[in-house]
């Protein structure tokens, strides 16, 4: 067998491989000899079928199967001998001429093919002990706990009927029945009976709640609204609609006394226990936000310390995934590049940079995990599946069965677990210092991004 490297351009490699007909024939004979003791043919005793007869009956299929395995094994040998880690699947170009193919299958001609690959570059890892990371820490203040409990109280507020003839005000709960039309035609999902609406809660289409102000029980109004451009239903998105709406009940919010009795309505023993639960929940939220900031800093350090040319095909794949998502979002919201103060070309350039960073960081994290034998256990994946199932009450078995029968979805759960374990490994080595910050400072970056 002869192997000739024909392309060595950056991370791209191409080889021309020649496999002698004699080698192919020998492999085919080995396969036929193995079949000899397994096949059953009329007129022959088990194990006594002549090889020549087997070749006539199974020759072409055995030859095709043998060549396929021979090519795969040969390629694996080429890559392992040179220490290549493949970025993508090899691109194999086999002979196309029909006569040449026939000659190869019949053992009359050598097999010559080409295999093109893109390799992962060698990565020299940084000294993680030189990394410095600042961990923001927020103490849960009593005022934070009080605010959290007030939000809970507001969400569980009681309502009482307003006096006969009273008009609806912001904050009131109005029970309505409505029939919606677009251009005079009813549409799916446009009808509702006895639906409670809290005016000012922003839980309905923009403009709907505002037009309920001043309505009385028994009164019917035509409410005119326009569905948002990013509305979930594409058939309704951006369209004007009218709802013939009748108020059937009107209630005013009642003051909620935050005491032991209120805590008991939530299943807790006392107000002190409610405060403890609220404080623990806030602490977990702050810890999660702090973790995200630490991780972002660490990824920035990894990015700065590992500059290399990533495989172009992986960058292109990552870019295509992001770009499809961007286009889908723009179509659903109706936004344009001009709305974002940019152009399509400028946006593409920016997202290609992001794709490059993501690919490089992915390769670096993979290298760290591999060199330090970091693995994700089956128990860790199972816990992730259970957590996902808990998020969908009543559909737990459906979620469990989905992941059991869908390896790709399971891999998507495994990936972030692996990444977090690698991050934890680096943090054990890095110099991490804590810094006391306020709640506002902790969430500042996220608020700025939302505003942008």
UniProtKB/Swiss-Prot annotation:
Its EC number is 5.2.1.8. It is an enzyme of class 5 (isomerase). It is found in: Cytoplasm. It catalyses: [protein]-peptidylproline (omega=180) = [protein]-peptidylproline (omega=0). GO terms for biological process: 'de novo' cotranslational protein folding; cell division; chaperone-mediated protein folding; protein transport; protein unfolding. The gene is tig. This is Trigger factor. One of its GO terms (cellular component) is cytoplasm. Involved in protein export. Acts as a chaperone by maintaining the newly synthesized protein in an open conformation. Functions as a peptidyl-prolyl cis-trans isomerase. It comes from Rhodopseudomonas palustris (strain TIE-1).
């Amino acid at each position: 067998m002869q192997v000739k490297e024909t392309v060595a351009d950056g991370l791209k490699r191409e080889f021309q491989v020649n496999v002698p007909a004699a080698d192919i024939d020998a492999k085919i004979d080995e396969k036929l000899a193995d079949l000899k003791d397994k096949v059953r043919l009329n007129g022959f005793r088990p194990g006594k079928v002549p090889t020549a007869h087997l070749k006539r009956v199974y020759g072409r299929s055995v030859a095709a199967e043998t060549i396929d395995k021979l090519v795969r094994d040969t390629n694996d040998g080429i890559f392992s001998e040179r220490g290549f880690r493949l970025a993508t699947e090899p691109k194999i170009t086999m002979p196309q001429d029909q006569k040449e193919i026939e000659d190869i299958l019949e053992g009359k001609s050598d097999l010559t093919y080409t295999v093109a690959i893109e390799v992962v570059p060698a990565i020299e890892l940084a000294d993680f002990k030189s990394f410095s990371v600042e961990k923001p820490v927020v103490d849960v203040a009593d005022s934070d706990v009080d605010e959290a409990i007030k939000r809970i109280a507001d969400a569980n507020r009681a309502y009482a009927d307003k006096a006969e003839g009273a008009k609806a005000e912001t904050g009131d709960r109005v029970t309505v029945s409505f029939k919606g039309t677009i251009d005079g035609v009813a549409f799916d999902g446009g009808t509702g009976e006895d639906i409670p609406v809290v005016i000012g809660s922003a839980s309905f289409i923009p403009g709907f709640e505002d037009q309920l102000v001043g309505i009385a029980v028994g009164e019917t109004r035509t409410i005119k609204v326009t569905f948002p451009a990013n509305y979930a239903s594409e058939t309704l998105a951006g369209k004007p609609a009218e709802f013939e709406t009748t108020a059937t009940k009107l209630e005013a919010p009642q003051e909620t006394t935050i005491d032991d009795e209120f805590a008991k309505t939530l299943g807790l023993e006392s107000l002190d226990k409610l405060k403890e639960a609220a404080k623990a929940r806030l602490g977990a939220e702050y810890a999660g936000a702090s973790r995200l900031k630490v991780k972002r800093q660490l990824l920035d350090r990894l990015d700065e310390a590992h500059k290399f040319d990533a495989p172009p095909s992986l960058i292109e794949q990552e870019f295509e995934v992001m770009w499809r998502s961007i286009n889908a979002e723009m179509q659903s919201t109706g936004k344009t590049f001009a709305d974002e103060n940019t152009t399509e070309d400028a946006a593409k350039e920016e997202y290609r940079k992001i794709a490059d960073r993501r690919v490089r960081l992915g390769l670096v994290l993979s290298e760290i995990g591999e060199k330090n034998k970091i693995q994700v256990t089956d128990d860790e994946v199972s816990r992730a599946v259970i957590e996902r199932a808990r998020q969908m009450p009543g559909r737990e078995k459906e979620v469990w069965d989905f992941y059991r029968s869908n390896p790709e979805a399971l891999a998507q759960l495994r990936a972030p677990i692996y990444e977090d374990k690698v991050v934890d490994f680096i943090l054990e080595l890095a110099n991490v210092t804590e810094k006391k910050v306020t709640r506002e400072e902790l969430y500042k970056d996220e608020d700025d991004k939302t505003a942008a």
